[in-house]
Amino acid sequence: MALYEVYSHPALLRYRSSICSKATLFILIVLLLTYIPPLLVAFRSYGFWLKTSTYEEQPNVRFQYDVLLIALSSTTGNYLAWSTYPGFNNLVGDKLRLPHISAREEDRNQDGKMDLLNFQLELPLQPTDNIYGVQLILTFSYQLSKMSTFIMQSMALIQYSSPIPGSQLYMNGDLKLQQRQPLNHRGLDTTYNVSVINRSSPFASTYALTNIISSYQERNVTTVLNAPNPLWIVGRAASDPFVIKAVIRYPVESISYVPGFWEMLKYAWIQYVSILLIFLWVFERIKIFVFQNQVLTTVSGPIPSLYKSHQS
């Protein structure tokens, strides 16, 4: 009658040797070569320790209703101006022109965070006035909270000029975050939670655009208005105001941050284990070859059966 294999299992052998033997030394060397080189390979391949990482978050942005406007009324340097800063308005004297401003923020997806700002400024003009360019600063409160809590006062600069006088400037863009250094992974950071412009200052240098921009760019974290297609509309009736319309969106940002210890360890462990598995497989085959073929002298024998041990 033909016989068929119904079950099989490997026979385990035990290889014994004294402590002071070549076999023991071989095992120690194999252990060192199995676990240390993967660590060196992972470390030397760079990126072993995760120095920076990124995550996505929509910031909590709110318009602060602080505005500084300079409208160029000629190509030779004349201008009209207005701001929400009393010190600046006192300094511009007869160049002050009071505009009409409307601003509305929208939360389109109803998640509790504003998604965009609709801003409109109407600057009244005399029939003989012309506008050749504008420089407009809007300020915002900007907050991140998914990892660390980061709070700052930021700004958007709207700037455009043309040799042809205009009736309207239309901007549609994103308020983008710019980082020179990553944020912390936890804690509270209010380093830049200070006004972009000191509203209590009476000095003209405080309101000079070069000084404002220079001071702002010293920050490691800023916002900038990215509006690649500004629209300058010409042709204004004598009684019409000059109009600035801006749609400023608050997009989801990719935030760079310094990961914590456990996150760095998790990332390093994944790299180490992926290389270690290869070394374990290779040196396991080497050990099988050495001991099965008695390259090094050992005493071999089967491992006692657990069932027989209980019977005895």
Swiss-Prot record:
Glycosylation sites: N193, N220
Pfam families named in the record: TM231 (PF10149)
Keywords, alphabetical: Cell membrane, Cell projection, Cilium, Cilium biogenesis/degradation, Glycoprotein, Membrane, Transmembrane, Transmembrane helix
Domain of life from the UniProt record: Eukaryota
GO biological process: cilium assembly; smoothened signaling pathway
Location within or outside the cell: Cell projection, Cilium membrane
InterPro entries in the record: TMEM231
Gene Ontology CC entries for this record: ciliary membrane; ciliary transition zone; MKS complex
Transmembrane regions: 23-43, 263-283
Membrane topology according to the record: Multi-pass membrane protein
Role description: Transmembrane component of the tectonic-like complex, a complex localized at the transition zone of primary cilia and acting as a barrier that prevents diffusion of transmembrane proteins between the cilia and plasma membranes. Required for ciliogenesis and sonic hedgehog/SHH signaling.
Assembly information from the UniProt record: Part of the tectonic-like complex (also named B9 complex).
UniProt record similarity statement: Belongs to the TMEM231 family.
Protein name: Transmembrane protein 231
Organism: Xenopus tropicalis
